[in-house]
């Protein structure tokens, strides 16, 4: 039994064709940003990235997909390579022009020099209620909309996450079905719910 698990652990994951750069497919642009002005999660700081496909036209509202724990999804060498997948699927006409928003959970800076920052991930992701949905709807998405034309249709909005990010995605859509109709919860940690 131990041997077989070691064999699986040593197997190299191979990306499928849609996760690899394809010749002739236009590449979108990814920009990194920092959010430090949250009223919903005061005192937190977080990085987020915006992916804009090459086919984006400001005169037409784009669909939007939010990724919790976004840093893992946005990296070219990450587990999902989401921008590459988006480039390929949009070019193939298999998904609409979609802006990706990749959000890391908040961090509360150290109070003293040499201290460690406090991660706010469990509070933001594992709590039931509308706080995270409010953070997105009232704070972060309006900031992104200053630069990009995002759809106002719930049918054109999706949210996803892995583990605690998955329960967070589910909870945001549960609390605001008028805002999110598509949810991807990869092995959502429904047992980590704070109560």
Feature map (PLM): residue ranges:
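Non-catalytic cap/lid and distal C-terminal segments of serine-dependent acyl enzymes
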Residues: 8-195
């Amino acid at each position: 039994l131990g041997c077989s698990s070691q064999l699986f652990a040593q197997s190299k994951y191979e990306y499928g064709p849609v996760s690899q750069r394809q010749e002739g497919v236009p590449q979108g642009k990814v920009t990194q940003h920092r959010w430090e002005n949250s009223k919903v999660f005061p005192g937190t700081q977080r990085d987020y990235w915006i992916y804009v496909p090459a086919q984006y036209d400001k005169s037409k509202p784009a669909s939007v997909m939010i990724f919790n724990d976004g840093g893992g999804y946005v990296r070219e060498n990450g587990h999902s390579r989401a921008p590459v997948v988006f480039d390929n699927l949009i070019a193939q006409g298999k998904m609409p022009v979609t802006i990706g928003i990749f959000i890391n959970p908040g961090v509360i800076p150290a109070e003293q020099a040499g201290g460690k920052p406090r991660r706010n991930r469990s509070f933001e992701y594992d709590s039931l209620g509308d706080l995270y949905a409010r953070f997105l709807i009232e704070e972060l998405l309006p900031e992104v909309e200053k630069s990009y034309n995002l759809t106002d249709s719930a049918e054109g909005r999706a949210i996803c996450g892995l583990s605690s990010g998955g329960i967070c995605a589910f909870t945001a859509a549960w609390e605001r079905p008028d805002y999110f109709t598509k949810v991807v919860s990869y092995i959502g940690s429904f047992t980590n719910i704070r109560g």
